[in-house]
Amino acid sequence: MDYCSNCGSDEVSKAVPEGDDRARYVCGNCGAVFYQNPKVVAGCLPVWQDQILLCKRAIEPRLGWWTLPAGYMENGETLMEAAVRETREEACAQVEISHLFTIFSLPEINQIYVMFLADLIEPNFAPGVESLECQLYQEEKIPWSQIAFPTITQTLRFYFQDLKFGSFSQHVGDFLRRDGKLIMRPQLKSDGTEITTHW
């Protein structure tokens, strides 16, 4: 941060404000404190019969890679509204959300991913401005090596795992970097068991 958005001063530096426990951007001229919080990404796992709707990205990062429709929440909308909007924008698809499915924390990049299971109302879809193409895939046809983000790969794996078990869960976890590798750690209760909610 180079300038204070409150007074325009360039006397902005990181400091621990009084009563706080971590460094924030603080203006040395007017004293304004700037809090930067994680961004929320909301999206859908759209299902049509035994197929999943994927979008090929038309933008960086991961241009040309496959993903589920998802994106940043806008001010003034709910999580579900954001997920439905992103699906409409990226895949021109109409969905009906059925359940909250995954919540992933990515502290390294200050993001929270929230994905919903959703039913395609009808199999009508087309690439939006952020997609090169959209396609329905059965599990064995999914281009696993070309999935854009680990959060999307894990969401898809949880879906097919739950589908085999015959019931769906809410999955909560953290994506952390360990020894140079990004790993997914499930959220655990105090007794060490994984936090899941079945329906």
Where are these regions (language model features)?
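Conserved Nudix-box catalytic region and its N-terminal flanking loop in Nudix hydrolases
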Residues: 47-85, 89
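A short, charged, Gly/Pro-tolerant segment at domain boundaries
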Residues: 170-186
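Acidic, metal-coordinating catalytic segment for phosphate/diphosphate chemistry
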Residues: 1-43
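Unchanged
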Residues: 73-158, 162-167, 183-199
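Small, basic N-terminal interaction modules of short regulatory proteins
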Residues: 2-6, 178-179, 189-196
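Conserved hydrophobic/aromatic beta-strand scaffold that supports enzyme active sites
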Residues: 3, 24, 45, 54, ...
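Active-site donor-binding loop signature of nucleotide-sugar glycosyltransferases
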Residues: 29, 57, 70, 118, ...
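Short connector loops at helix/strand junctions that flank enzyme active sites
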Residues: 22, 39-41, 47, 61-63, ...
